[in-house]
Amino acid sequence: MSLCTLEINLSAIKANYRLLKNICENSVDFLHNVANKEEFAGNTSPRTAAYTLVREDASLGSTPKLPLGASYAKNLLVGAAVKANSYGLGAIEISKTLLEENCRYFFVASSNEGISLRKAIGDEVNILILNGVFEHDALELIEYNLIPVLNNLNQIKIWQKFSNLKNQLLPCYLHFNTGINRLGLNHNEIEQLINNRDLLKGLNVEYIISHLSASEDSDNPYNLEQLNKFKAYLEYFPNAKASLANSGGIFLGKDYHFNLVRPGAALYGLNPLGSNKPNPMQNPVTLKAPIIHLQNLTYGSRIGYNMTFTTKRDSLIATLPFGYADGFSRNFSNQGTVFINSRNVPIIGRISMDLVNIDVTDLPPSDIFLGQEVEIIGNNCTPDKIADIIGTIGYEILTSLGNRYKRIYT
């Protein structure tokens, strides 16, 4: 059994979900409210600009425009991105928790993630496969009632092929690329769908979605550019519902919400507003490790692989039982920090596969003993904060959390 414990506070995740739902359901202009508080004063500007139709070329102009559907503000739903095992925290446990909050839309990356989730939480929810459908897994998607997000014409053809094979209308989402340029139907493919609706024959397009590239940066004009492009495309698909906002998109304002929002990072305590603004979310993650070894070293002692740290005084060094095999980046060598009783303690020497050394010389003797718990991740050192130390993001910190930690759900 692992000596290190990873505690996931499900109540905090519930609270985060409720906050996001409240912002959406009540059209709370969170950024405006924050900007007007003295302690958060700054140059925050919510995106409330009027919708402007954007076209990439004149060819769409020859196609008759159709009116947009019913008001998006009505019946707005809050789903959850639980891909990558809920960012390393446990998709099954967290999905069951969100079910208690009436969440019914769960987004995963692949069919195997979707199948595992379906087996665990039953048939009452919608499970969306963001990477879409492929020849090898189409029958499994049908068997387990998983809905693919179709990202290109080839995936549409595959799903249509199996619709014909099964002689049934198959549900799907369409992903329109509005500028992030990863997955998603491109402009030419969307134009083909507009001009030839037979390309979607046999398919029930439930939602049209897109994905924001810089939603955590509320001042980035690219957000509005993507929004306008998305709305322009939606005019030609009046019967489909729409989804655009991820965690950061929720905070950009109601214009970005449409029918369904898809938070992920914010549920798990990561800051949806970027590193330069206060985090409105609760941190649900605590990683602790015990001191398993203590040694007094004299001035000039060298520590760890390749002797990258040399003591500059007589020092008391503690060793902790985790390392890069547990997803704790080697980049924290000689620059990471941990906490003992809310006191900052430096990491020294190279991060090893299974071990980390820390310098506890300056701590009170009463705080230093074998078995003493050390906070690696927690309220003193959130995933976002420790990510900043090595120039990465909190997402990577969470998704790297290894399987050797004993996970405890509270």
UniProtKB/Swiss-Prot annotation:
The keyword Isomerase applies. GO terms for cellular component: cytosol. Pathway: Amino-acid biosynthesis; D-alanine biosynthesis; D-alanine from L-alanine: step 1/1. It holds the Pfam family Ala_racemase_C. It comes from the Bacteria. It catalyses: L-alanine = D-alanine. The active site is at K83 (proton acceptor), Y305 (proton acceptor). GO terms for biological process: D-alanine biosynthetic process. One of its GO terms (molecular function) is pyridoxal phosphate binding. Its EC number is 5.1.1.1. Its cofactor is pyridoxal 5'-phosphate. CDD domains: PLPDE_III_AR (cd00430). SMART domains: Ala_racemase_C (SM01005). Residues 28-76 form the RPE1 insert domain. Catalyzes the interconversion of L-alanine and D-alanine. May also act on other amino acids. HAMAP family: Ala_racemase. This is Alanine racemase. The lineage of its organism: Bacteria, Pseudomonadati, Pseudomonadota, Alphaproteobacteria, Rickettsiales.
